[in-house]
Swiss-Prot record:
Subunit structure: Oligomeric complex that consists of at least the alpha, beta, beta', gamma, delta, epsilon and zeta subunits.
Protein name as it appears in the record: Coatomer subunit gamma
Protein's organism: Anopheles gambiae
One GO cellular component, as annotated: endoplasmic reticulum
Subcellular location, record wording: Cytoplasm; Golgi apparatus membrane; Cytoplasmic vesicle, COPI-coated vesicle membrane; Endoplasmic reticulum
Keywords for the protein's UniProt record, in alphabetical order: Cytoplasm, Cytoplasmic vesicle, Endoplasmic reticulum, ER-Golgi transport, Golgi apparatus, Membrane, Protein transport, Repeat, Transport
Protein origin, superkingdom: Eukaryota
Amino acid sequence: MWRTKRGRTRRRDAGGNPWQNLEKTSVLQETRMFNETPVNARKCTHILTKILYLLNQGEVLGTREATECFFAMTKLFQSKDVVMRRMVYLGIKELSPIADDVIIVTSSLTKDMTGKEDLYRAPAIRALCSITDSTMLQAVERYMKQCIVDRNAPVSSGALVSSLHLASTAGEVVKRWANEAQEALNSDNIMVQYHGLGLLYHIRKADRLAVTKLVNKLTRQHLRSPYATCFLIRIACKIMEEEDASGNATEDSPLFNFVECCLRNKSEMVVYEAAHAVVNLKRTNPRELSTAVSILQLFCGSSKATLRFAAVRTMNKVAMLHPPAVNVCNLDLEGLIADSNRSVATLAITTLLKTGAESSVERLMKQIATFVAEISDEFKLVVVQAIRSLCTKFPRKHAVTMNFLSGMLREEGGLEYKTSIVDTIILIIEENPDAKEAGLGHLCEFIEDCEHTSLAVRILHLLGKEGPYSKCPSRYIRFIYNRVILENATVRAAAVAAIAQFGACCPDLLPNVLVLLNRCQMDCDDEVRDRATYYYTILNQSNPELNKRFIADHEIVSLPLLEKSLNEHLKGPLAERFDLSIVPKSQVIQPEVNEEVMIMNKAAPKIARVNREEVNTEKLLAIPGIHHVGALHKSCAPVQLTESETEYTVSCIKHCFAHHIVFQFDCVNTLSDQLLENVRVDLELPEGFVSRAVIPCAKLPYGDKESTYVIVQFPEDVPSSIATLGATLRFLVKDCDPATGQPDSDEGYNDEYILEDIEVTVADQMQKSKKQNFLAAWESADTEEWVEAEDTFELSSVTSLQDAVNTILKFLGLAPANLSENVPDGTFRGGVEVLVRSKLAVADGVTMQLTVRSTDMDVAELITSAVG
């Protein structure tokens, strides 16, 4: 006996997965044992476990294999073994999406669901709902209602959760179970109450008034379940956010009072959820924020690692938006730097980096360096994000942060981690001229041993863009040419393009660049040879205008739209040359910053980001006559022209071209007994505007969104392009059957609906573009080709610099440059370049001196008048 026990212990200590070498074919052959009589419950349970293991490891069963296995599994219902029966339920759930004719087990599952054995009932409900569709659900509806209000908590919870899953396919049937869900909400069991609230909210969520009544009722009574209370807090916050968005918020909100009361709940879970909600609500004032932060501060001293982690993670997020509110917790956060849990320590330091003083930066960076190698890439990303915000806050500390980042670059890590570091270094280079030389040097060292092609290409592009304007451009050519010798074809092609930039921008380096490009023409790769030949031919002509137009100019067209336009051109008769000017330029897309640090879903693929112009161009190309107005300059965000509760909802998107503006009206008919035809919008145009075309919507059925367009030509006089236009929606109404949507007769009557006025502003006509060096661009614009307009304004309605910047941006349609008081340049419709410099001073109000440089005097005056 002693030997047997020791042998088992040795096998267990040896570790390893006993099923890692399972083969699908052999396991499926073993399922023949399910047909034996009597059923060997122990062996069948073991086989079922193997099947579930294979399925959960991603093994794919064919429809025939799954069906045979499923039907063999149904033979096991004759056994009364509880463990095996529960495994059968799991097998049915896993195989039901693959196998055919799974409804054959409906009667067996219904019998178990309504039987006396409670251990069978809950899993039988879950299995039954996995094979039930909307057509079969009515047959078991009565049983489901009974199970929802069952006294046995697992049965009731199983029915409630299954109902939630069924709601996605049979929502109308599940809505009839609201009374039973309401009864479950009054249960004493914490899970039943939680699941009951979840189902009841799902049933009523489309009815805003019903949800509000439900929340108001529940906030006045004490919920036994902390899970339900947490969910109720989330619903209340969602309602408050909707009220804020619609402008119906009140200062003394009963819902906010409920959330604030939950800060004093006896459950730590509820207290944290309430604190998390308070700090994330936009309406929260400093007093309320300090109360929530005090709660989080208490949690920082908890003996539970989960509470400490939750508290410091939330404070990390608060520090992004309200650093002063977290300053009071700096001592507690310093104590967490030495926490045994590295996740907590990392978040504590990164929070301190956001809230601490400039003098503490070096000390904190040294503390991070002691354990940064021990943490995972996921937490290293959080450190990099904190350093990025630190660079914005303390630009003079760029030497410390740059050295730290370069050290992290040399360590082992994945592509996402290294990309985050490179992004941060590039941000420092672009926004801090003093850090440019050091940053480029660190990146040059990194590409000497970079295993990621995408990063190497990106860095080479940056070197080609910034290197020619550095103090010693020649030092970077050696690093770049090394890539031509040592790297793969993709990197070599990028290196050739970077070398050509030096030849175009640095005349003294041109002879050396031509020698290098001549060598590259011998490359074994077509792309590298073609690029080298292309750049060599242009540079060899020593024509600065050619160099600027074909090499140094970084403005490119939108590649997706270029591809689409070329395909359309090739499908045509090819009688005319392709006109590149009709393709919109690629605009700057700001990188998306994920404020929810520590939530990183690596399974979800990244969606390629496109700008608004690329999204809208496909629709616009279908408009008759649109090709004559030229390339799309800018598409604006939608503006609502009606209230959301009205019978017809209309939103307007303004598409600006060089000399025209296209108004796109997206219309929705919310009346089920009406069909609208010949839907159009008539505009009251001010003097100078000319209507060129109106494209109506032929039919607008109930619930559908359709578009109608109006093409308008701008006035010749640029200042007159700022105007307010009246708008009226006109249409033909036909009464119809709400069930079918078919009109009762062919006759109808004309009707109209007055819309909100439409404003055409400077911001609508201005497209942001990014200059890497604003100061250099500003100085280069001090020539005879440019005109300058300057004026001083008293912004009496604002009291802070941030409000002043926001006001300027609202009028001009530009974005603030990080780390400066400058507003980046932009391009007015028609390609007129614009540079704007704004100086702000705070006294009783904010005084602003606005200086505009542009290649068109009318545009310069228009921009200054927009603020005035």
